[in-house]
């Protein structure tokens, strides 16, 4: 079988690291990276996705595109998401149509469903919420409820991808992945976000006379309620790098989908997102479950 030629936009962020760590160098793929800045270790087509003419040559000869490039700040305002997330996504679709690239994996986000979490947290993070007989779970047919302009821009992205899959000829296979809590290798575990908060507190130097409110800087002590709530959230929402890479591989191997939505989340017992649809359609079988961890990496994990 010949290699698949795969273009990755925005490959050097948290989600992209899963590709670099778990897929780059695999004999099945020949990757091209498109990013607005260069990287010392990887050959990169340097261009801003808001500039169609600059990105267009990178799409020639590709079999698939993994579109990760975006303004990923969940708190971004409207002006912050228009060019990278709306214009940029349209440009990627236009370039795929013009270069006749058949397959797109679109990096959507759990923030498309963010108000569900806002309305139900922190109880949502319990394995037995709302009861031991009726687990709260969102699937691909649940109505989007974004929690900000970033999430709304991803709703737009999902819908314009659907339009192109149905109307424009290429791409004619689109996988919208609502990605949940992928982290860099250093924090690729359910305690990662909580430990980052501890580190932020350790790094902060309190100036003379300063009244420092840790909560305003996203920092906390390891034995605090904030730490535990962050652990609870990640035990529900964590997506390990290897599970995310596996889901990408499932999409790249599939030839049945015209357009569909899947949740990129590990097999966490407390997850509030469905993975059964991805299992049934794509053969996704996550290897990780956050409930197996009862401490950060220097602690213990049930399967180690």
Where are each of the predicted segments found?
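Conserved catalytic Lys-bearing alpha helix of Rossmann-like short-chain dehydrogenase/reductases
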Residues: 86-92, 101, 153-161, 244
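Conserved C-terminal active-site "lid" loop/helix of NAD(P)H-dependent oxidoreductases
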Residues: 223-224, 260-262, 267-285, 300-304
